[in-house]
């Protein structure tokens, strides 16, 4: 009995990882057919549930939240297959996995349909959204055997979060009190020289995330849809620098009719931040200039980072969260409490009213 109680207590305090990715054979095959395996500037890592669980056990991670990796496939069928695969993993390993479902954007009607299916039938714990999604013309160019030209990419562009066309989707997600996990994707168009020396993940991913969140704030999206909670990846990207600058420029933008009223408090209150990437005490302190400790979450970015590196990074985080006197009070909050509270709050209660 005592052993069971100790084991249960240990599991209850296990780390929650809100940033991990599922990579299925169907996903890889679809990208290969579209000629997009190297879209992000680096090859996709291999993924196996057994290896994921092995790392989680070694590192002391109790629960991982799965999301579809970048880039976004153009096939709604592949998106559905990935969501069903993630749901199956969650079902087969209760307590070890949650998942946030991908959507087949930019088709908003299909996206809402998939969100309903994922949340109601697959019991998804939230929704994953790309910072931008492209239309199908550049995909079709590749499928037809030619590389998309600069003209294709300029004409296609990328539809960023915050675009008015997505209001219907955000209204639905607001009704469902959804947790949304953001992830940066390749910007459209992208100068080919950008990736000559470094992959997109090094710099453009941070720019993409900052751009998408700034776009949502500028349209007051998270104030208008106040039941939505958004997890921003990679230590908040450039937002600790961008938000003060955006605030200072808002009067000028308003004077030039570029933006309307922005409820800064409401928008920022909706944002949570994972610590995947180059976390450190200094980074966390910088993030606390734009948020509060109850909005910080542990994230690994598994399997894009080697297991050994992730384990060492988590050990280092636990140590500085214990040793740094100003951060020590937030240790359990960051490692597991905030994530559990966030995802528990996203689950609908019977008869709940989300219309207000």
Which residues fall in each region the model found?
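Hydrophobic alpha-helical targeting segments used for export or membrane insertion
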Residues: 2-12
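Catalytic metal-binding/acid-base residues of hydrolase active sites
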Residues: 21, 132-134, 185-186, 236, ...
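Active-site gating/metal-coordination segments in enzymes
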Residues: 62-63, 67-212
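Glycine-enriched alpha-helix->loop->beta-strand junction motifs that scaffold or abut catalytic
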Residues: 122-126, 175-179, 198-201, 225-227, ...
């Amino acid at each position: 009995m005592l052993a069971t109680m100790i084991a249960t207590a240990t599991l209850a305090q296990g780390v929650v990882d809100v940033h991990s990715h599922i990579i299925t054979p169907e996903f890889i095959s679809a990208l290969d057919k579209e000629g997009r395996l190297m879209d992000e500037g680096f090859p996709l890592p291999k993924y196996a549930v057994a290896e994921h669980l092995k790392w989680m056990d070694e590192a002391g991670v109790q629960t991982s939240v799965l999301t579809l990796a970048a880039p976004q496939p153009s096939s709604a069928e592949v998106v559905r297959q990935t969501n069903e695969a993630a749901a199956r993993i969650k079902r087969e390993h209760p307590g070890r996995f949650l998942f946030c479902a991908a959507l087949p954007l930019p088709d908003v009607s299909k996206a809402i349909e998939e969100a309903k299916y994922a949340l109601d039938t697959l019991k998804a714990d939230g929704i994953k959204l790309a910072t931008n999604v492209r239309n199908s013309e550049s995909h079709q160019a590749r499928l037809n055997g030619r590389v998309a030209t600069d003209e294709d990419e300029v004409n296609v562009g990328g539809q960023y979060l915050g675009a008015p066309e997505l209001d219907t989707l955000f209204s639905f997600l607001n009704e469902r009190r959804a947790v949304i996990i953001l992830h940066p994707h390749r910007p459209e168009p992208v100068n080919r020289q950008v990736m000559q020396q470094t992959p997109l993940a090094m710099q453009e991913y941070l720019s993409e995330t900052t751009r998408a969140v700034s776009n949502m704030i500028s349209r007051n999206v998270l104030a208008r849809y106040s039941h939505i909670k958004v997890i921003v990846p990679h230590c908040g990207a450039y937002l600790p620098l961008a938000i003060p600058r955006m605030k200072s420029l808002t009067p000028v933008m308003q004077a030039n009719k570029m933006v309307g009223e922005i409820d800064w408090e409401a928008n920022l209150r909706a944002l949570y931040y994972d610590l995947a990437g180059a976390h450190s005490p200094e980074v966390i302190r910088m993030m606390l200039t734009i948020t509060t400790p109850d909005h910080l979450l542990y994230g690994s970015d598994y399997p894009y980072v080697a297991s050994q590196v992730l384990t060492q990074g988590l050990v280092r985080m636990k140590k500085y969260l214990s040793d740094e006197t100003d951060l020590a009070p937030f240790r359990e909050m960051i490692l597991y409490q905030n994530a559990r509270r966030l995802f528990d709050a996203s689950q609908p209660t019977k008869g709940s009213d989300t219309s207000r």
